Curated annotation (Swiss-Prot):
Biological-process GO terms, alphabetical: lysine biosynthetic process via diaminopimelate
Assembly and interaction partners: Homodimer.
Encoding gene, per UniProt annotation: dapF1
Protein source organism: Nostoc sp. (strain PCC 7120 / SAG 25.82 / UTEX 2576)
Record site: Could be important to modulate the pK values of the two catalytic cysteine residues: H166, E215
Protein name, entry field: Diaminopimelate epimerase 1
Catalytic-site annotation from UniProt: C75 (proton donor), C224 (proton acceptor)
Amino acid sequence: MAIEFTKYHGLGNDFILIDNRASKTPAITPEKAVEMCDRHFGIGADGVIFALPGENGTDYTMRIFNSDGSEPEMCGNGIRCLAAFLADLEGLSRNKDTYRIHTLAGVITPQLTPDGQIKVDMGLPRLLAGEIPTTLGAADGKVINQPLEVEGQTWEVTCVSMGNPHCITFVEDVAAIPLEIIGPKFEHHPAFPQRTNTEFIQVVSRDYLKMRVWERGAGITLACGTGACASLVAAVLTGRSDRLATVELPGGPLEIEWSEVDQRIYMTGPADRVFTGKL
């Protein structure tokens, strides 16, 4: 059976989008997703995203298979791409259209704005060790500036969940981090029973952060939306940042706000269609 798809990217974090609205079961297996994501022998992507029927009163359901076949709870850049994909499927003009999307991390609400950006209500950050989850500290306590030994070096880390686990550490120069070496060590560290995404953050000013990321199940990527959100939260918790800041990723900038009004995280950034095809 031929599979129609459209490729999108959010700041270079790229995804294969599949219209799965006719069924609650993904059209392909995780093993097939691995083949499709291969950048040499497949289409090439960081993951495959399915637009499925909504659940519990939502408009749609989002599921993702990473490039290694694993299934994350949510993806920030991915949900912006999904919102753009749905708008294109429905023939909408991207003018203040809002979707309620069911994900494994809860209900996420992206809004398509007149300037072509997509603003996403990412919900409340989860800060307790048991929610992340991590074995660092007590399960009912926060993990802020905790020591973590990785590869013989002690790192100060702050842990945040945006529905998926993030371990954030602040460094002098993100460009100097050997991400391909140290990233997998963080991801598979025994302190993270469900593995973890890891963000290395350089604070340029209180409203400007530079970030590099090792994504759980995908490795080095050009951008990570949930990671940018978690990193701002970590920067605020450690007194390094204001609650509204630009997070500069290798693929470009995201605007992240941790609202003082409702304590929710709002992410604003682009999502662009690359091409369509059939496999």
